[in-house]
Amino acid sequence: SRFFGDLGFYEIARVEDTLVFMENRRDGFGAYLRDLEKTRTEGKSAALVMNANPFTLGHQYLVEKAAAACDTLHLFVVSEDASLVPFTVRRKLVEAGVAHLPNVVLHDSGPYIISNATFPSYFLKDEAAVIDGHARLDLAVFTKIAAALNITARYVGEEPASQVTGLYNQIMCEQLPKAGIECVVVPRKEANGKAISASTVRQCLQSGDWDTLEMLLPKTSLDYFRSPEAEPVLARIRNAGNVVHY
């Protein structure tokens, strides 16, 4: 890292001697933290991070559970544009789907939480050892964000289907308590005896199964996908082939 420091890179976080996260702006992360600090509140603050590709009734249930258990819920939407549903749409659907919860503060994750910089294997589906290192680095950055916002708990949805997210959750529950942050795993909301998942929603959008979508999406997301505005996104999903891990 000293070599990159000489080239004008600045360290943000490191995992022992295996990984270092650096950026080429002197105050990029500092400015991001100062911006976040404007939304810092007294009382119990918690965090939730979601990709929401797209925002489902499962996501809404998770946000409602977390919001009910704290004074302020900081909800970070993954802003890396590596998903079938573009970030601008994902954020809009999250915002619409949580509008009834006054104590939820929405944030963009920027390049600092689950991004190609901190956690590339989230998008690449790498092997376990690589995922482990990237997850630890991502969480090392997150603990600095948590300190800026006085966050003492992070909520996650139970993850039976995805190896990457399941491993990330496991490492989170090991690492965050060391930084004084409780890790709360919430059982998934079900429809017809199955956990609601965004991958099932993408499959239904691809095949045009609107009956199933009515059971999986909040009205706000459903209205969007039925509108002419959604046509470019639907075309992208229809043409994507395998949409399960996307």
List each model region and its residues.
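Nucleotidyltransferase catalytic core that binds NTPs
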Residues: F3-Y246
